[in-house]
Amino acid sequence: MSTDVSSAENEGGAPIRTARVPKYYRLKKHLLDMTETLPPGTPVPPERTLAAEFDTSRTTVRQALQELVVEGRLERIQGKGTFVAKPKVSQALQLTSYTEDMRAQGLEPTSQLLDIGYITADDTLAGLLDITAGGRVLRIERLRLASGEPMAIETTHLSAKRFPALRRSLVKYTSLYTALAEVYDVRLAEAEETIETSLATPREAGLLGTDVGLPMLMLSRHSLDKDGRPVEWVRSVYRGDRYKFVARLKRPQD
């Protein structure tokens, strides 16, 4: 594979060799510039066409395209081709619901219930919910969508003892937070949220309509009420190619 080597000079005049630039990276940069000028849904030229245009192999073209798919700049649709992707959904890191976040972006939030039932708390989950190990926990797994597009898989855990009959209450109140407020007079006041990366499992990829192994954003949120009592522990997996999180930072007070 051919590469470019460039050099510069430091303050003493001695040359500084910079990193080699792989050929696929130059192609990737060209494609990236192209995506910034074309509307979402625009088809990308086929691999064969790009290989001929840039006098390179289809393997090199495939590598450039795959990196842009992983980064969320391009979208590959099975049997149709590769297209310019829609801009990522941007979410501020704050204590709001998924519904509030999506509506703030002008998107229509919907959910599909994947599973709901009771599990037995292990030591870790018991500590998070401030219950006895072996206690019952209501586990709710939902597929979160934005204007019909799958965005995340969200799994919520709540103490069955603290919130009796919550499963029945959710039939009346489709919003979990509304049910907690109206039925149990419990509202979230603060939370600790951790963001990590993971790779999409076959099940996650199938539900989210993406590729197995695609980078995901994995969020863990531990929410408390105004008295500092645990309310929920939530583990969410968001599509890394469609989602980004934004935080506003301030310097600590002296």
From Swiss-Prot:
- Domain called HTH gntR-type: residue spans: 17-87
Q: Which InterPro entries match?
A: Bact_HTH_transcr_reg, Chorismate_lyase_/UTRA_dom_sf, Tscrpt_reg_HTH_GntR, UTRA, WH-like_DNA-bd_sf, WH_DNA-bd_sf
Q: Which UniProt keywords apply?
A: Cytoplasm, DNA-binding, Repressor, Transcription, Transcription regulation
Q: Name one GO molecular function term.
A: DNA-binding transcription factor activity
Q: What is its main location?
A: cytoplasm
Q: Which SMART domains match?
A: HTH_GNTR, UTRA
Any single Gene Ontology cellular-component annotation: cytoplasm
- GO terms, biological process: negative regulation of DNA-templated transcription
Q: Where found in the cell?
A: Cytoplasm
The UniProt annotation gives the DNA-binding region as: 47-66
Q: What does this protein do?
A: Global regulator that is part of the nutrient-sensing system. In the absence of glucosamine 6-P (GlcN6P), represses the phosphotransferase system (PTS) specific for the uptake of N-acetylglucosamine (PTSNag), and genes involved in the metabolism of chitin, as well as several genes involved in development, thereby linking carbon availability to morphogenesis.
Official protein name in the record: HTH-type transcriptional repressor DasR
Instruction: Tell me what organism the protein belongs to.
Output: Streptomyces avermitilis (strain ATCC 31267 / DSM 46492 / JCM 5070 / NBRC 14893 / NCIMB 12804 / NRRL 8165 / MA-4680)
Q: Which gene encodes it?
A: dasR
